[in-house]
Swiss-Prot record:
This is Anaerobic nitrite reductase HB2. Homodimer. Pfam families: Globin. It catalyses: Fe(III)-heme b-[protein] + nitric oxide + H2O = Fe(II)-heme b-[protein] + nitrite + 2 H(+). Residues 2-151 form the Globin domain. The record marks 132 as: Homodimerization. Binds 1 heme group per subunit.
Length: 156
């Protein structure tokens, strides 16, 4: 079916609202990833040997903002382009790093759950099943693009 006009509007409107608080929402997003899957901590060089709270770790904060913004902004592009558009070099890098870290399907599901919970918390009473479906579709498209690049690199 693809990404509909209505889904795009839901993602775009909620993203415009969330952009006001990117640093805090990004930290919440990453905290949820670590809460859902504590072993994920070992996948990040800046977290491996650290017991610091996420909000006190500047490398985590910077990474969280980058990941959260890219995820949300690629969702916005989905309707415009009909596919997730991430720069070719960025996509190659994402595929490469995810392959190196041995990221598997369950890891993508953890990130998806954390993203959906973050958006739900941020949007409050605006959160509905339709919004959940829109963000799910957008995230699934981004994850598929990263996985395709991972497979391409593994086959090379």
């Amino acid at each position: 079916m693809g990404f509909t006009d209505k889904q795009e509007a839901l993602v775009r409107d909620s993203w415009e609202f969330m952009k006001q608080d990117i640093p805090q929402l990004s930290l919440r997003f990453f905290s949820l990833i670590l809460e859902i899957a504590p072993v994920a901590k070992n996948m990040f060089s800046f977290l491996k040997d650290s017991d610091e709270l996420p909000e006190n770790n500047p490398k985590l904060r910077a990474h969280a903002v980058k990941v959260f913004k890219m995820t949300c902004e690629s969702a916005i592009q989905l309707r415009e382009k009909g596919e997730v558009v991430v720069g070719e070099t960025t996509l190659k890098y994402l595929g490469s790093i995810h392959l190196q870290k041995r990221v598997a399907d369950p890891h993508f599901e953890v990130v998806k759950e954390a993203l959906l919970r973050t958006v739900k918390e941020a949007t409050g009473n605006k959160w509905k099943d339709e919004m959940k479906e829109a963000w799910s579709e957008a995230y699934d498209q981004l994850a598929s693009a990263i996985k395709a690049e991972m497979h391409a690199e593994a086959a090379a």
